Amino acid sequence: MKHWRKIVSLSLALLLFFSSVAMISAEEIKQEQATLLLVPLDDRPANVYFPQKVGASAGIQVISPPKEMIGKFTQPGNGQEISKWLLENGDQADGFVISTSMLAYGGLVASRTGVKSLEEATKDIQVIKELKKLYPEKPVYVFDTIQRLAVTAISDEYLKYYSLISEWAVLYDKVVNLGMPGKERLEVLESTIPATVLEDYKKARARNHTVNNLMVEWVNEGYIDHLILAQDDAAPYGLHRAERELLLQKVNQLDVEDQVAVFPGADEVGVVLVSRFVNQLYKTSPAFFIEYGGVHGKDWIAPFEDTTFDYNVQKHIVSAGGRVVDNEDDADIHLLLNTPSESGTPRLEDIEELVARTNELTTSGKQVAIGDVLIVNKADEAFVTELAETVDLTKILAYSGWNTAGNALGITVGHAAARTAFLEQQSGFGVPLYEQAAENHYEFLLHRFAKDQGYKNVVHPAARAYIGQIGASEWDLGNKYDLVNSFVKERLTAETVNWYQYFDDKEVYIGSRGNKDFYKTISSLENVHVNLPWPRIFEAELEPELDLE
């Protein structure tokens, strides 16, 4: 089995010839592509690499500010510099996707602290209004988060308060807002959690809620074309519940329900809004037919979420530019969701049926996207193992099992809707752009399986054990970072090579021009980039590079 391309000697003349062709093709591709400026939630792969790959798989360029502007881990991004960057590059853009959390506070982690005042935060988001005034015809999509229950686990000390503050926020909502029992435990928590930690938490929540409200008002005033307020990790009860209800009331009062979506999630929203831009660009709206591999979404509230899952599915599809259909004959995309088995149903039976259904659809030429939402933060190992042995993975349109159900859902839906929109558009792009888009598509698909199964189920547990052996903390690697990073690089590269076997030498469809369909063969895995972006092992950069011939 081929894994790595053998490097052979070429004559200088031949090398120069092919280099010239590549340069011409690259320039032609750039001229054909639309450009989207993305201000990400933070610098992690889910918020930068994922949207860029999904955009590239749909034939567009997604460009984010330089790394030094968007911060890293506990170092916040610079909203003022990012605002300048947006204004300096706005002329070249065809649209904007902007994280308010990055502009206002410096990113997701910084948004959970009260360091930035409300005055400072609102000052740094004024660029949103400026962009719409300068470019009224260009779409401005904005997303913000409704703060999660817990603080960020940036150290073992903060990890101690992670669960306590979550419990306090849930109990406060039950006892104070809803008159339910639990007052004694609430008082114990308030005496246990340091006053400074609790006050900072409440200060951040109040400020963020004010900014959430302001964004809804800006939709009504015409500065924002579509707004997503994503509920970060939550539960059915908590301070966020009251905040969400107030926001929904405001949305209804202003009659902007068609432009504002409120749903559980956070890290997937960049992908969702890239997909929305793609579908607007190509004037498409893919039809999704939804099938559940286990319990129906109306009967399940996923962990860390506060609404029924079917509600979340509907909201993600519409925000991504798609639509839901009740008749599978009308579907452009079959969305298969790997949900928990119903009581009394053997798990293996559900797995076999879902894999068989996937195989039935793909072999008959249907587009299938899979949301592996069963287990938080990783693939359902039994399911993806059976899937890989039974189904041609290159025939699957999109897959994700990463993090919360909402995260996995949004990544799957966004990738599927964007890729479908590109394949259905009639813009008459040149073949080089189809080739480039296909490479990006299959690279991201390989990334998803290798990351969600290979990293989360194999490498991550091994890395956790290794960290214990060398006396480090998985939440702050400190001076052990290089050791752990090398450990992860070696093993995740091997896992990616292993998953590449299901892509190697497969002929794949890349697009059509007129009446002619074009195909390429996945010929090699050229490179695998692996790195830990933050000094912890929760997430890893994984960027495989494929060659199609």
Name each region found by the language model.
Residues 28-549:
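An N-terminal assembly and electron-transfer interface module characteristic of large anaerobic redox
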Residues 7, 22-24, 108-110:
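A generic structural micro-environment signature
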Residues 11-12, 528:
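Generic detection of intrinsically disordered/low-complexity segments and helix-coil linkers/edges
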Residues 1-11:
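Bacterial N-terminal signal peptides that target proteins for export
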